[in-house]
Curated annotation (Swiss-Prot):
GO terms for cellular component: endosome; lytic vacuole. GO terms for biological process: imaginal disc-derived male genitalia morphogenesis; negative regulation of cell population proliferation; negative regulation of Notch signaling pathway; neuron remodeling; Notch signaling pathway; phagocytosis; positive regulation of receptor-mediated endocytosis; protein targeting to lysosome. This is UV radiation resistance-associated gene protein. Disruption phenotype: Larval lethal at 3rd instar. Adult viable flies exhibit genitalia-specific organ rotation phenotypes. Keywords: Coiled coil, Growth regulation, Notch signaling pathway, Phosphoprotein, Transport. One of its GO terms (molecular function) is SNARE binding. The modification Phosphoserine is found at S214, S218, S666, S668, S685. The keyword Cell wall biogenesis/degradation does not apply. The modification Phosphotyrosine is found at Y667. Residues 681-696 have a biased composition (Polar residues).
Length: 696
């Protein structure tokens, strides 16, 4: 493995190390290749080969395998460990795992001579092998985990007294073994030899710390183990057995010179290879015309005139066998060609490797794309199945949807028609007429134009107009208008901007939106004087806002100053809607039934003569209940309108009903309750500004 140590025997010095790089040989003693319970069929010892392997640990691969030798009972001598591995030479490992194997030879398995076995093998081959003729794998006999500092040196006399399956390690010219593999008698003789070598008068006083680098490797109290594993800093030896060594400086110098020598040798080898490579390239075409020389050029002065230094080197290198210049030239051309081809080969290899990696990446990408495509195909397939199911369901539900849509449209038309009918009936209840002079009447009660009534100007026309209007009539008319607006909002299902608190002639309106300086948000829609108060004017202004809101929401246009005009426009629009839908129903149902009757029916089921014969004193409790289509409309109206309202609005079968005004007597609450109580703070609301006449 490495150079042998210069000392003739091993000394237990603290500076002398036991490492894996110092291992030279391993020997085996008393190795048994079969268990104690011998089977009926024993192996022939000549067929069994023993060898060992070295491992860094029990589970690692073997980094060294010895030769296979036939089994010998007493001593198994394997060859020295020889390796050129630099890692082995420089290793600093203090332990190693040794495994001993049993190998079966395949030449003499069936008891025949090797010549006959080889002839049979050549003839028949290995086509018909029985289980008894198949090669058997090697078997592990035992394995050791060896820590070199725990081994003890052995004397030649002690080797014969080793135990079963004992391994002996040769380190630094000395043989070491495990103390557990040595018998007690051998240990006693080993102790005797130790005392003879290191007598008390020949060695120094033993230190208190049991020497340098001498840890307790065993828990045993045996003096033999303690003395065999001890390391000493100094030892007394015979003078004739000691040879003086170099100091540290000289050793470092020798090491440096050895390194320089090795470096020079490597450089010389590189120069020789370069000379051998370039010697052929020195031949030129001019030298080919010269005659080839058969002798050396050394000593010939004229040779330097015709030959270059490269030629001289070529001749010197080829003195043993002269080569013709033409041959050298051909060799030069071939060498150049070979170098060019080698360069091309390297380039092609690099390009092939590049294309191989590119193809590998492309194949990987193609594989991923295929997987993605398959996943997408599967997803699309499942989505298509789901789509087909949904399409079938939609095709099944399409007629129902069309039928429901037609029903919805029909119901919407019926609801609109019913709303229009109810609103027109409200118009019949609260009949609004223009009595001339920009005055209107509701249920026979005259009411002036609201813009003039709420105007702040003191013109003679306004004063005369106000003198002709009674406060009680104004209160009753405002109550009718408030109730009409509230009923319109309920029937048309429209929220009002300003909430109305209806009490026939004492109605009030609430402003919940603006910031007010008044202490209350309820404003009266009645008055007791000819000139209305500020609260009454503001209440009329809020009522006009509600009317304008409804008119704009239904008709799309409104005039805030013309309250009764907005109501009349609203009634005209709803009458047109009701008439149009009635014509559509009549066209769909056919005109034959209408022609047979000779008279057209209105929305409430009555004819025009019935409407002309109506009277305001008709008792609503004695109106006959509707049948047929009207019953369906009433049921639909009860579902659409809020509870409590549908019952009050489902009035059908009468032509005209006039509401008799509730007489307004003395009011219990006066206008003093709604005196403006202005706060002293400032507000951005437009309600605290004095209402003026709205002008276009």
């Amino acid at each position: 493995m490495n150079l042998r140590p210069r000392c003739r025997k091993w000394l237990p010095l603290a500076t002398q190390q036991l490492r894996l790089r110092n291992l030279n040989r391993i020997q085996g003693f008393n190795i048994e290749s079969w268990p104690h319970e011998k089977s009926l069929e024993l192996d022939d010892p000549d067929d069994v080969l023993l060898y060992y392997t070295l491992h860094t640990d029990k589970a690692s691969e073997a980094f060294y395998t010895s030769e296979k030798l036939p089994q010998r009972h007493q001593q198994q001598k394997w060859a020295e460990i020889c390796t050129d591995d630099e890692a082995w030479r420089k290793t600093n490992a203090q332990c190693v795992c040794v495994k001993v194997w049993k190998h079966y030879s395949a030449e003499r398995r069936d008891g025949q001579p090797p010549e006959v076995e080889q002839r049979h093998k050549d003839v028949f081959g290995r086509s018909q092998l029985t289980p008894s003729r198949l090669p058997r794998p090697p078997e592990l006999l035992f394995s050791w985990g060896v820590y070199f500092s725990g081994l003890i040196p052995l004397s030649p006399l002690t080797l014969s007294q080793c135990g079963r399956n004992c391994l002996v390690f040769q380190l630094n010219g000395e043989q070491f073994a495990s103390p557990s593999m040595i018998s007690e008698q051998a240990l006693q003789s080993q102790l005797h030899l130790h005392y003879q070598k290191y007598a008390e008068e020949e060695k120094l006083e033993e230190p208190q710390d049991e020497g340098i680098n001498s840890p307790a490797v065993s828990r045993s109290s045996s003096p033999v183990l303690r003395m065999s594993t001890m390391r000493y800093a100094q030892l007394k030896c015979q003078r004739q057995e000691i040879r003086r060594s170099n100091n540290l400086e000289k050793l470092l110098t020798l090491q440096r010179l050895q390194r320089l020598h090795q470096q020079k040798r490597r450089q010389m080898a590189e120069v020789c290879r370069e000379i051998a490579r370039l010697s052929v390239h020195c031949v030129t075409r001019n030298e080919l015309r010269l005659k080839p020389r058969t002798t050396s050029l050394s000593g010939d002065y004229s040779a330097h005139q015709y030959h270059s230094m490269g030629r001289a080197l070529s001749v010197l290198l080829a003195e043993q066998q002269q080569i013709a210049p033409l041959t050298l030239y051909n060799a030069q051309q071939l060498t150049r060609r070979i170098e060019a081809l080698s360069s091309q080969q390297r380039l092609l290899k690099a390009e092939r490797e590049t294309f191989r990696q590119r193809n590998e990446r492309t194949r990987q990408l193609l594989k991923e794309m295929r997987e993605q495509r398959e996943a997408q195909q599967w997803e699309l397939h499942s989505q298509r199945h789901r789509l087909e199911k949904e399409r079938l369901e939609l095709r099944t539900l399409a007629p129902q949807h069309l039928e429901q849509r037609d029903q919805k449209r029909q119901i919407e038309r019926q609801v609109e028609r019913r709303m229009s009918t109810l609103v027109l009936e409200l118009q019949e209840i609260y009949n609004i007429q223009n009595v001339g002079g920009r005055q209107f009447s509701i249920c026979g009660i005259a009411f002036p134009h609201m813009e003039q009534y709420t105007s702040e100007s003191r013109q003679a026309a306004n004063a005369q107009l106000l003198d002709n209007v009674s406060p009680l009539a104004v209160s009753a008319a405002l109550g009718y208008v408030a109730h009409l607006v509230q009923m319109l909002a309920i029937i048309m299902d429209r929220p009002l901007r300003n909430r109305i608190l209806y009490e026939p002639s004492k109605a009030r309106i609430v402003d919940d939106i603006k910031e007010l300086t008044y202490t209350t948000r309820e404003f009266p829609l009645y008055t007791r004087s000819i000139l209305p108060s500020q609260q009454t004017k503001y209440a009329i202004y809020l009522l006009r806002q509600n009317v304008s809101q409804l008119c704009f929401d239904i008709t799309g246009q409104c005039d805030l100053r013309n309250t009764f005009g907005n109501l009349l426009e609203l009634f005209s629009t709803l009458r047109y809607i009701e008439r149009t839908q009635r014509d559509e129903v009549d066209e769909r149902d056919g005109t034959a039934v209408g022609a047979g009757c000779g008279e057209a029916r209105l929305a409430n089921g009555l004819t025009a003569p019935h409407l002309s014969q109506s009277h305001s004193s008709v008792d609503m409790n004695h109106v006959p209940l509707p049948t047929g289509v009207n019953a369906v409309k009433d049921a639909l109206l009860q579902q659409l309108l809020p509870p409590g309202v549908s019952e009050a609005l489902a009035i059908e079968g009468y032509a005209s009903t006039q509401r008799i005004c509730r007489s307004v007597g003395s009011y219990s609450d006066g206008e003093d309750e709604f005196r403006p109580r202005l706060e002293h703070n400032y507000s951005n609301s437009d309600s605290n500004i004095t209402l003026q006449t709205e002008r276009s």
